[in-house]
Amino acid sequence: MTERHLFTSESVSEGHPDKVADQVSDAILDAILEKDPMARVACETSVTTGLVLVFGEISTTAYVDIQKIVRQTVKDIGYTRAKYGFDGETVAVLVAIDEQSPDIAQGVDAALEVRDQDEKDDIGAGDQGLMFGFAVDETPELMPLPIALSHRLVRRLAELRKEKVLPYLRPDAKSQVTVEYDDQGQPQRVDTIVISTQHDDETTLEQIEKDIKEQVINEVIPHELLDDETKYFINPTGRFVIGGPQGDAGLTGRKIIVDTYGGYARHGGGAFSGKDATKVDRSASYAARYIAKNIVAAGLAKKVEVQLAYAIGVAQPVSISINTFGTSDLPESKLIEAVRKNFDLRPAGIIEMLDLRRPIYKQTAAYGHFGRTDIDLPWEQTDKVEALKASLAE
């Protein structure tokens, strides 16, 4: 039993500078995978006033027009006017791309285990590292409630902006939600909501506060979670006209907690965007979420965290760890046994299991990689439920 407590998570909109960088990196990755599914991509992006810098290591047979992809991505986000200090037409795009290091490539091309002649041992992990996956029964999508609500708020802001319902909104925005949990660890109410949204110069704070409460908060936060004690901070600085890459420089991979579980679960430190699936930072994090979600969906635990760890150039994970936080009747060793039996966690196994050589990544680069109900992502499927139950019944 725990004490009543508060927990807070945040999200950012697609127009946040770090998210602009993530989307550019993943748009380039998708364009390359469309033509060359076997490409090795590690694409980083930095954005600032009037400038996008694309750099990293890419080995591919494909040609893609990086300038064109960058400009279109920036425009799609909503940076279409020079007065924003950053727009798709006039922004300078610098490209500095190298090939993947041959020292890394040799470990990925032929894993340590390849001598055993199993073709799934052909691909070694692209780096060492540890990755976490998590699921909890607080929401239908099996995500922690604070991050789920935070994502809903900024997605709603983008929707109202793009549909011109609130035409004064600009692309950059952030949200933060504090949830109160009872002594059983169950969410009871929303304690605090913070929303900061970029806006046109002429719009008053009073207008913004009214619109955000009526058309954003009341539309996406369940009414039973709000009460007279809920606190609201809407544009608490009073003004947010200068924003996006003009207000702050942005960089790929700087919003890894927004991308995952909002701090509710641990994180191994590796970012996702701009990386192809031989990079276990990305693919093994997706696999760990897939495992965790299926365990909770099967009713085997109410809350579970899965850790995977890899060595560079080695196909098999060096460790698998599962923590059910006392919410399962099963020993964690039994769950690990069932996971090993039903999930191939070698990089090639994950790539095949989740079909990760497809251009599916740009859509994940804003509003979270997990718990998405608006798009169809393979690691969000619960198609291993029966197999897990069957393994544990043996």
Curated annotation (Swiss-Prot):
InterPro entries noted in UniProt: ADOMET_SYNTHASE_CS, S-AdoMet_synt_C, S-AdoMet_synt_central, S-AdoMet_synt_N, S-AdoMet_synthetase, S-AdoMet_synthetase_sfam
Family statement drawn from the similarity comment of this UniProt entry: Belongs to the AdoMet synthase family.
Residues engaged in binding Mg(2+): D18
Subunit structure: Homotetramer; dimer of dimers.
EC number: 2.5.1.6
Species in which this protein is naturally found: Enterococcus faecalis (strain ATCC 700802 / V583)
Taxonomic superkingdom: Bacteria
UniProt pathway: Amino-acid biosynthesis; S-adenosyl-L-methionine biosynthesis; S-adenosyl-L-methionine from L-methionine: step 1/1
GO biological process, alphabetically ordered: one-carbon metabolic process; S-adenosylmethionine biosynthetic process
Residues binding ATP, per UniProt: H16, D172, A173, K174, R239, F240, D248, R254, K255, A271, K275
Positions of region (Flexible loop): 100-110
Protein name from the UniProt record: S-adenosylmethionine synthase
Any single GO CC term annotated in Swiss-Prot or TrEMBL for this entry: cytoplasm
Record has Ubl conjugation as a keyword: no
Catalysed reactions listed for this entry: L-methionine + ATP + H2O = S-adenosyl-L-methionine + phosphate + diphosphate
Cofactor(s) needed by this chain: Mg(2+); K(+)
Molecular function as annotated in GO: ATP binding; magnesium ion binding; methionine adenosyltransferase activity
Record Gene3D superfamilies: 3.30.300.10
The organism's taxonomic lineage, starting at the top: Bacteria, Bacillati, Bacillota, Bacilli, Lactobacillales
UniProt remark on cofactor binding: Binds 2 divalent ions per subunit.
Function: Catalyzes the formation of S-adenosylmethionine (AdoMet) from methionine and ATP. The overall synthetic reaction is composed of two sequential steps, AdoMet formation and the subsequent tripolyphosphate hydrolysis which occurs prior to release of AdoMet from the enzyme.
Keywords: ATP-binding, Cytoplasm, Magnesium, Metal-binding, Nucleotide-binding, One-carbon metabolism, Potassium, Transferase
Cellular localization per UniProt: Cytoplasm
